[in-house]
Regions:
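Short, intrinsically disordered, charge-balanced linker/junction segments flanking boundaries
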Residues: 1, 211-213
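Glycine-rich beta-to-alpha transition loops that act as phosphate-gripper elements at the mouths
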Residues: 90-98, 197-201
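Small-residue-centered hinge/linker elements
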Residues: 1-87, 96-186
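Secondary-structure end/capping motifs
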Residues: 179-210
Length: 213
């Protein structure tokens, strides 16, 4: 759904008049970051506890972050929806709803975007650096002792181990498949069949609508 909006809703605290409760999901997702499961659990519970709540709006502006925290938030939204099936949940995207942000959004009944919003990035990322060549050039020797053959896996000062690299890639693939399934469960038959949908690409809001995102 395409939405051209100037958003200015507020969360009604404890009032009895009919209203839509607003929950802001703004920033990076992580246990110690702006968006985290603990704070969200408290916010959504207050929203449902507020008398007169007729709907819940998730105002999302997030590039993503922890898949664990995003998954916990997604699960909590779905849990609350089962308890309160008469209260719809809407995700309203501002500038960006990518990766973990989108992981959260798909738990909503409907997703609204601006035509220029950034949406998608359904993928998993793990990055790092390698300093082995630099160490050789400056004459630095790495002295590393471990108990457990894989304890120093992905150590940036050691050469890449192909078996360990394959292990990590498989782990990332598994998390990616979990993400894909969550999107499919949330969007259902609205998703269009495209090889790019789950590739990690992102789109503007207008294009995302055509893909069923």
């Amino acid at each position: 759904m395409l939405l051209f909006f100037a958003f200015g809703a507020t969360h009604t605290k404890g009032g009895s008049s009919n209203h839509a409760a607003l929950i802001e999901i703004n920033g990076v997702i992580g246990e110690k970051d702006e968006v985290n499961a603990k704070d969200f659990f408290e916010s959504i519970q207050r929203a449902y506890d507020s008398r007169g709540t007729k709907g819940i709006i998730l105002k999302i502006n997030s590039p993503g972050g922890s898949p664990v925290q995003a998954g916990m938030i997604n699960d909590e939204i779905k849990r609350q929806k089962k308890l309160h099936p008469h209260i719809p949940v809407y995700a309203v995207v501002e500038d960006i709803c990518a990766s973990g942000g989108y992981y959260i959004a798909v738990a909503a009944d409907e997703i609204f975007v601006d035509k220029a919003s950034i949406v998608g990035s359904i993928g998993v990322l793990m990055d790092g650096f390698g300093f082995t060549d630099t160490m050789k050039k400056v004459g630095v020797e790495r002295r590393l002792m471990t108990a457990g053959s894989n304890k120093a896996m992905l150590d940036p000062f050691s050469p890449v181990n192909s078996k360990q690299q394959a292990f990590v890639q498989e782990m990332l693939n598994q998390v990616h498949q979990q993400f894909i399934q969550v999107v499919k469960d949330g969007r259902g038959n609205r998703l269009k069949d495209s090889p790019d949908t789950f590739s990690g690409l992102f789109w503007n809001g207008e294009a995302a609508i055509k893909l069923g995102l």
